[in-house]
Amino acid sequence: MHQAQSDLRRPLLILLAFLLTFPVSISATDERARERNAMVHEQIVARGIKDSTTLSAMRIVPRHLFVPVAQRPYAYQDRPLPIGYGQTISQPFMVAYMTELVSPGPGRKVLEIGTGSGYQAAILAASGAKVFTIEIIPQLAEAARERLDDLGYGGVAVRSADGFYGWAAEAPFDAIIVTAAAEFVPPPLIEQLAEGGLIVIPVGSPYFVQTLMLVQKRDGKPYSTSLMPVRFVPFTRATK
């Protein structure tokens, strides 16, 4: 009788051990998905972002995997977070806002200046765009390349270079997103923009509030519209 009870308990104990072990990761994954959905609903949709492609990408891409481990508890809060080397990952709303402005999608070719951790590039790729991204800090560029590849966004082309000069070999681009504040729009970026294309860029002093600008190329000339006050890290140039 004792042996029979023992035999019955054994599979139950094995099942209990399995349930105690594996749901931890599943539960954590579900919790992060809930956090992302809440982020989209409370921070992004509530502030007027409507593009379904952008919203879908924001729900899918795991922002917590694009920040240092110490910052992951705050990954789905509406604020920028430090990622090292004096750089930050933009707040979720700003990423969604800039993404919606350029309307990424299949067939669209988008250049990003300022890869950082790769989050904005992942959002653009998840929206269906063909993405090229430039990061001036080699360590960030390499880490972003590996991270994007590990998360299934290996199609994103990452390059370490001075973003001021764009990526002439891959031009023209349908859209260019700049994630650092420049004192003016770099002329090479305008040159590399397709006719009718858009540049989204924060313009102004790196020490004060800047203005997010939307630049459209029409008849070969740039036409700018001021959108909102913003604060971005400075546009870093290569030292001579």
Question: What residue ranges belong to the model's regions?
Answer:
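Conserved nucleotide-cofactor-binding alpha/beta core module
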Residues: 103-223
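Intrinsically disordered, low-complexity segments enriched in Ser/Pro/Gly/Ala and basic residues
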Residues: 5, 24-26
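Short amphipathic alpha-helical segments with coiled-coil-like heptad repeat character
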Residues: 2, 66-68, 197
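Bacterial N-terminal signal peptides
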Residues: 11-23
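Bacterial N-terminal signal peptides that target proteins for export
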Residues: 2-14
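Class I SAM-dependent transferase core
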Residues: 26-111, 119-123, 127, 140-142, ...
